[in-house]
Amino acid sequence: MAQRGRPRNFNRTHALDRALMAFWQNGFEATSMHNLVEAMQINSPSIYAAFGSKEALFAETIDYYREAYARQLLQSLNDAPDAASGIEAMFEAAIELFTHQDTPGGCFVVNSVASNAPRGLELEQVLTRLRWQRSEQIAERLKTDVRAGKLRDDTPVQDLSDLYAVLLQGLAQAARDGLGKTRLMRLCEHSRHLILPWRMN
């Protein structure tokens, strides 16, 4: 049973993590306040007092997801010595996240858009922007390699980055549908090959 008041040792990060799991599993609309109370183990007045509204709580879980779960994808992309290796590392990190046994599966952002997305225009725009932010990040990595002479000047940066972003979303949905990690990793191995025609010798 949920506690009747906000516990003295209320941990906002822990509460956000539990709310994230509920939204990740069910989607925004299908996650009821009862679901959140059970997941977060605090009562609804305390949830409203701490976060303002269900929409505001969802918005905060988006930020939390980016920092606590999805940050590794960007770090993997940028820490590699070249874009091809970075994209492969990003895909590997994504698959680890999408198939982790302690999460509902897939990508929280993609799941939120695909099923029971929030109806408010502002949150819809935030989710859409986040989905395509990966394309922008990959494009920056490709441009870095072009400037460094690792990729040809005629590299179709936008086309490649959009394609990779779409592939990531597809991997997320496949993981959500239960496609195993081994099969997903085999797909990941081919990710670097898309860049090969534009690599400098």
Report residues per predicted region.
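N-terminal intrinsically disordered/low-complexity leader segments
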Residues: 1-10, 155, 199-201
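Amphipathic C-terminal alpha-helical segment
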Residues: 97-100, 144, 164-182, 194-201
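Amphipathic alpha-helical packing segments from all-alpha helical-bundle domains
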Residues: 70, 85-88, 121-147, 159-162, ...
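Hydrophobic alpha-helical connector segments
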Residues: 60, 74-105, 157-164
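Hydrophobic alpha-helical segments that form the core
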Residues: 105, 110, 114, 155-174, ...
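Helix-turn-helix
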Residues: 2-3, 14, 22-56, 60
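Short hydrophobic clusters on alpha-helical segments that form packing/core surfaces
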Residues: 15, 19-23, 94, 168, ...
